[in-house]
């Protein structure tokens, strides 16, 4: 699939001296202790995929416009000190910072900056305008409990949330796609989540979210955090933001947090099924139990060959 991320290289960026990663088209798990840079790695890869909506809206985007868009994206994702790009340059490094990503369709984006730079300098954008598959980033904290009014507040005020939270709220507020256009595995996953939660989350627009059972309706805030987290995945499938074989990579930071054992097992089953049907998934975790569920539930032949573990 041309939407998949194949290769990432980070040099003198944040805490990375020279990091090179090759990605599986299916499941990728980044493993490491707190503070090893897992979230930074996810955000860097996600940020380099940010050209997709830009080129969709303006196919003839110039280098200057692309540099401005990517710079703004990185600043909002990483929120460096004083909102300065140069603060993301690796401390004490003498060479420029370098970020590059290569995709399965041959598209590439590479950019550099120094510790005094105000904007990224694009060095290579080979066929990058052809990469138009939008990606999804699910942050560690669930967002259903504070979605109402969040997007307008985020645009108006300097909230202490990085842009992954605004991005996910915007995707969750999209209307659902027609049922007949949903992937069969998406329908299956949504039904499984509804079954284990005992109901479903309903999105009314404007960030208003409730939880409905057969006989009653409740505030989303009254539901367990693990259920809200599962509800986010279900909604992303319902809106088509995650569409196996069509959408770009799914980045998920610590998907296991606040999940009970039954929910964690179901989550792994769903992620494996989505990956088998063309969805690239890139996770970050330090949880042994999550890794064990992948080990127990994956197909020992096919899944093992296409699942990649990277420790940081």
Region roles according to the model:
Residues 311-312:
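Serine residues within intrinsically disordered or low-complexity segments
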Residues 1-54, 210-308:
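Switch/communication elements of ASCE P-loop NTPase nucleotide-binding domains
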Residues 2-9, 49-246, 308:
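Phosphate-coordinating catalytic segments in nucleotide- and nucleic-acid-processing enzymes
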